[in-house]
Amino acid sequence: MNAIEAQHLKHLTHWPDEIINAIASVEEAEIYMKAGLKPARIGNRWALVRSDINWSDYSVRRNTWLKNKLADYSKWVDYNNADLIGEGFPPRDVNGDPYELHHIGQRQDSPFAELTWAEHMGDGNNTILHKAGKESEIDRQQFEHEKSDYWKARFKAFSPSELRKIYGK
């Protein structure tokens, strides 16, 4: 993305420079804008976060196929999305699919974007977000730890009023 495009994107979105500078193309930015993502500081990193996750929702009970996958199914049966992220796991959409974290700019220290699978990999987005032929700079083992830490930090970012709304107390 050239300087004029970056300046225009900043004017449109008001995203911080750390996010703008990590975005490689206008097409990439459009994916994040179409998803309605907003900037937030989560832990020690900038991220583009979703506002449409229902933190009170998601019951493992609705997805009985998980009984066969989880040895400790009974532990998770009453967890909602907020509980999941508090444990370091991604929240789930209404279908039970996990939201994904994407490194904006594909560098280890890049800001994250919270995306659905379709936003991340579907409809040609995979080739926009992951440049073909370019070696990934992401250490996958480190990323596994970062994802867990990110979701825990996302939970800690809830305000007391948000927690009351989630848990109805």
Residues of each region from the PLM?
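Nuclease and nuclease-like effector domains acting on nucleic acids or nucleotide cofactors
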Residues: M1-Y99, G105-K169
